[in-house]
Regions:
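Amphipathic alpha-helical "stalk" segments
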Residues: 1-132
């Protein structure tokens, strides 16, 4: 029983191409060319560590009451981060949020993304803005 590493490598490459074409189709279905260009001009790698931390912290708070002080403070931090990513294009941020709430995100596109986390954060953010 030898492992055919070449076959595995070929399978992984096919999977990557399939995933890339799925992401491309999803992008074309949901965004205008200008919006795709907005994303293309962003350095998402730079914010990857921050995003990983945000998703991890959000997940760790899901057993808390969304109106608790700890979750509300985090909701403000989450919004500060989100707003900084969509400077000059807040409507695109809202569109992306709606896609995340609906679960219409290709698997692996946003590391750490889980629809349940987004729905929890949506409750917390709703409470945050109802107090302002």
């Amino acid at each position: 029983n030898t492992i055919d590493w070449q076959a595995i490598a070929t399978l992984l490459e096919v999977f990557k191409m399939t995933h890339d074409s799925m992401v491309k189709e999803w992008s074309e279905r949901n965004f205008t060319e200008a919006e795709v260009n907005f994303f293309a001009n962003k350095d998402f790698q730079q914010s990857k560590v921050e995003n990983d931390e945000l998703w991890g912290e959000a997940k760790s708070l899901m057993d808390k009451d969304p109106s608790s002080l700890k979750v509300q403070n985090f909701a403000q931090k989450w919004m500060n981060s989100a707003n900084s990513k969509y400077i000059g294009n807040p409507e695109l941020g809202k569109k992306m949020w709606e896609l995340m709430k609906s679960g219409d995100i290709p698997e692996g596109l946003i590391p750490g993304y889980e629809q349940e986390i987004v729905l929890f954060m949506n409750k917390a953010i709703g409470i945050l803005y109802s107090k302002k």
